[in-house]
Structure formats: structure tokens, C-alpha cells
Amino acid sequence: MELVKVVFMGWFKNESMFTKEITMMKDDVQWATTQYAEVNKALVKAFIDDKKVCEVDCRG
């Protein structure tokens, strides 16, 4: 199990933005990205070492 520092960047329908930086298990990044997107009804992108590793859009 590998710990990584992940930066989540999210955009709401009204174009406002949020960021969150956490250290977590690499295997959980996709799940966490989906949760942030669903809960916030936002487009969320996850970055590890400045590389986008996943993206989920729940702005509907």
C-alpha cells in the first residue's frame, strides 16, 4: 500500500473553485475523487506530482 500526496481541484456549476490536499492510499484516489464530485455536485480532478490521475464530473 503506497501513500501519496493528492491535490483535488474542483469546479462548481457557477464556476467557483475549491482545492483540497491530502495524503492517502494510492488505491483510494479514484474513490475519493468520485466522492468529492458527487457530494459537491462538481467537476473534480485529482493530481499526484502535478499529473492528473483521474477526473469525475457530477455537475449534471
UniProtKB/Swiss-Prot annotation:
Effect of gene knockout: Phage grows very poorly in wild-type E.coli K12 or in cells expressing plasmid-derived toxin-antitoxin system LsoA-LsoB; if the host has a deletion in rnlA-rnlB no effect is seen. Absence of full-length transcripts of late (18 to 28 minutes) T4 genes, and thus loss of synthesis of late proteins. Partially suppressed by overexpression of host IscR.
Repeat as UniProt keyword: no
Protein name: Antitoxin Dmd
Pfam family, one: Dmd
Subunit text: Can form a complex with non-cognate host toxins LsoA and RnlA.
Membrane-spanning segments: none
Alphabetized UniProt keyword annotations: Evasion of bacteria-mediated translation shutoff by virus, Host-virus interaction, Toxin-antitoxin system
Domain of life: Viruses
Gene coding for it: dmd
UniProt cross-references to InterPro entries, sorted A to Z: Dmd
The keyword S-adenosyl-L-methionine appears for this protein: no
Functional note: Antitoxin component of a potential type II toxin-antitoxin (TA) system. Acts as an antitoxin against host toxins RnlA and LsoA, preventing them from degrading T4 bacteriophage-derived mRNA and thus permitting successful virus infection. Stabilizes middle (8-10 minutes) and late (18 to 28 minutes) T4 gene transcripts.
